[in-house]
Swiss-Prot record:
One of its GO terms (cellular component) is extracellular region. Expressed by the venom duct. Keywords: Cleavage on pair of basic residues, Disulfide bond, Secreted, Signal, Toxin. This is Conotoxin Sr5.4. It comes from Conus spurius (Alphabet cone).
Length: 59
């Protein structure tokens, strides 16, 4: 009998959880991976620019 309240609470939590398809994708949605790729590219450009300013030989 002690497990019954826990079981009921879990059922309520599962039922109220948002589903994966809660929001439909639009044409403006961008995958998160592209943001990470852009950040890595920007960071790489900054490192190269800094290297060129400091050492002059890596350009």
């Amino acid at each position: 009998m002690r497990c019954l309240p826990v079981f009921v609470i879990l059922l309520l939590l599962i039922a109220s959880a948002p589903s994966v398809d809660a929001q439909l994708k639009t044409k403006d949605d961008v995958p998160l991976a592209s943001f990470h790729d852009n950040a890595k590219g920007t960071q790489h450009k900054r490192i190269i620019n800094w290297c060129c300013l400091v050492f002059y030989q890596c350009c």
